[in-house]
Amino acid sequence: MLAMDQGVVEEWLSEFKTLEETAVYNYAVSLKEKGSLVPALYKVIRENYSDLLEPVCHQLFEFYRSGEPRLQRFTLQFLPELVWSYLSVTAARDPHCSGCIEALLLGIYNLEIVDKDGQSKVLSFTIPSLSKPSVYHEPSSIGSLALTEGALANHGLSRVVYSGPHLQRETFTAQNRFEVLTFLLLCYNASLSYMSGSSLQSLCQLSSRVSICGYPRQQVRRYKGISSRLMVTSEFLVQLITGIHFALCNGEVDLGSKALDDVLYRAQLELFPEALLVGNAIKSSLHGASLKSNKEGTRSIQVEITPTASRISRNAVTSLSIRGHRWKRHDAVDLGSPDELTEIAEVDEGICTQASGAQSSPPTIVISSSAGGAAAGAGKLAGKGLRRLTGRSSKEKDKEKDAATGMDQLTRKQAAVRAMSENLELLSLKRLTLTASQSVPKSGSLSLSRTASAVFSRSFEQVSNVFSGNQPSSRASSPTSNHVAEQDEGVAYLDHISPAHQHRQRSPTISIHVTSDL
C-alpha cells in the first residue's frame, strides 16, 4: 500500500471522530468529492494483514449505525469485497485475520433484521391480480376501480413473505454463515442503483471466484487465488445473479457476462434449480447491442413498464364463464332436405345398410340409453325408425308396408343375424364413431360400460365374408345379450326393407340399447 493512500485513509479516520451530529449530513454529501478515498479503502480491505484494516472496519460500522442513508450506502458499496475477504480467509483456515471483517458483517446484519422499534423485520410483497388495476400490468376491463391510495390499501390480496423474521447472530458458524451472507446481499441489492462502478465490478469478481475456485474452470479464468472449493447455497447464488443482472445493464458487460456464466456453471454442478432458472432467464433476455450502448447514463435495468400494445385478453376466462359454457356438438346436422333426414334416421336408429362396394365406409357403433325393457326398447326403436322413414317418398312408404309382412320371416333368421352382428362388431373396432344418439344413462339405469363389455366380450374368432354374400353360421344366443339380439333384429329388418339404399355404400351400424331392467 502506498504512503499516499495510507495518508488518505488516516485523514478519513480522524475526520469522523471529531464530527458533530448536526454536521453528519453535510459530511455524507462531501464523501463523493473524495475520489481517492474509495480505491484506498479497497486496498486496505484486500490486505488481510494491514494495520488499518481494524480501524477501517470500525469506522464503516459507525457509518452504518448512524442511520444516515448516504453513510449506510457508502458502507454497503464495500460489501462484495468484504464478503470475499471473509470467505477466502475462512477457506484458508486463518480466523485471526478475519475477526474485524466478521464483526462488521455481523453488525450490519443485526442492524438490518430489526426495525426502528427493535421488532423483527419481515420483508414481503403482494402478488398482483389481473382482475384489478395494478402498477405491474394494464388495467383490465373487468372493473373500473380507480387506482387510488385507498384502493391499494384495501385491495384484499394476500402478501407473500420472502425474508424474515431472522434471528440475531453473535458469531459465524458453518450452519448460519450463508444465511447471514445471503441476507446481506439482499440488502446490497436493494441499493444497487446507488452503487458505484467499482462496487459492481467487485460484485462480478466475487461471483466468479466463489463459483469457480477448486473447479477446472479456475484454470480457464487464470485465477491464482485460493484453490479450495467454497460451499454455496442456491439462495446465495440467486442474490449474486440479481446483482450481476444490474451490472450487465449498466456498463459492466464483459465482467457481468463472465460472472453469469460462472454462476450458471456452478449451479449446474450443484444442481440448484432456482439459480438455474433465474440465470438462464436473464441470459435469454440479454441483447448485446442494447447493453453496450448503455455504458454511460442513468443506471437502471431495462424493462418495459407500459406496453405499447394490449397483452391481456379483454374476455377474461373466469369460473363464471366456465360454468356457463356449453360445448357444441361435433355432429350437429341441419334437418333440411329429405336426404339428410334419411341419413339421420339411418345413424340414430341403428339402420345397417349393407355395403357391396370395395370402398365401403368403416362401420359405426350407435349407443343409446333407455329406461324401459329390452323388448320394448327394440320395438320403440323400430317404430321410431319407421316414423322417420314415413317422411320420405311414396315408394319408400310402399316398401315399408311390404316390409311389415316380412317380420315373421326375420324371426327365423335370428341366429344368422347374431352372427352378422358379431362380424360387424369386429369391423367396428377399426373405427369407433359415437353418433348423435349417444346419451348419458340416468341414475338407476344399467351402466353403459357394463352392457358394452357384455357385447364386446364375445369371441371375435368367427369372421366371415358377410358383405360378399356368404351365409353366416348359426349360433345360440346367451341371456346376457338378448336385448342386443332383439335390437339387431330391428337393424336387419330395416336393412332388409331398404335394398335400394345399398348403392350409397353407407357404413354398417351396430345399435347398442342400454336398459335398466336387467
From Swiss-Prot:
<dbReference type="GO" id="GO:0042552">
    <property type="term" value="P:myelination"/>
</dbReference>
<dbReference type="InterPro" id="IPR018619">
    <property type="entry name" value="Hyccin"/>
</dbReference>
<keyword id="KW-1003">Cell membrane</keyword>
<feature type="compositionally biased region" description="Basic and acidic residues">
    <location>
        <begin position="393"/>
        <end position="403"/>
    </location>
</feature>
<comment type="function">
    <text>Component of a complex required to localize phosphatidylinositol 4-kinase (PI4K) to the plasma membrane. The complex acts as a regulator of phosphatidylinositol 4-phosphate (PtdIns(4)P) synthesis.</text>
</comment>
<comment type="similarity">
    <text>Belongs to the Hyccin family.</text>
</comment>
<dbReference type="GO" id="GO:0072659">
    <property type="term" value="P:protein localization to plasma membrane"/>
</dbReference>
<dbReference type="GO" id="GO:0046854">
    <property type="term" value="P:phosphatidylinositol phosphate biosynthetic process"/>
</dbReference>
<comment type="subunit">
    <text>Component of a phosphatidylinositol 4-kinase (PI4K) complex.</text>
</comment>
<dbReference type="GO" id="GO:0005886">
    <property type="term" value="C:plasma membrane"/>
</dbReference>
<protein>
    <recommendedName>
        <fullName>Hyccin</fullName>
    </recommendedName>
</protein>
<feature type="region of interest" description="Disordered">
    <location>
        <begin position="466"/>
        <end position="492"/>
    </location>
</feature>
<dbReference type="GO" id="GO:0005829">
    <property type="term" value="C:cytosol"/>
</dbReference>
<feature type="region of interest" description="Disordered">
    <location>
        <begin position="385"/>
        <end position="410"/>
    </location>
</feature>
<feature type="compositionally biased region" description="Polar residues">
    <location>
        <begin position="466"/>
        <end position="484"/>
    </location>
</feature>
<keyword id="KW-0963">Cytoplasm</keyword>
<dbReference type="Pfam" id="PF09790">
    <property type="entry name" value="Hyccin"/>
</dbReference>
<keyword id="KW-0472">Membrane</keyword>
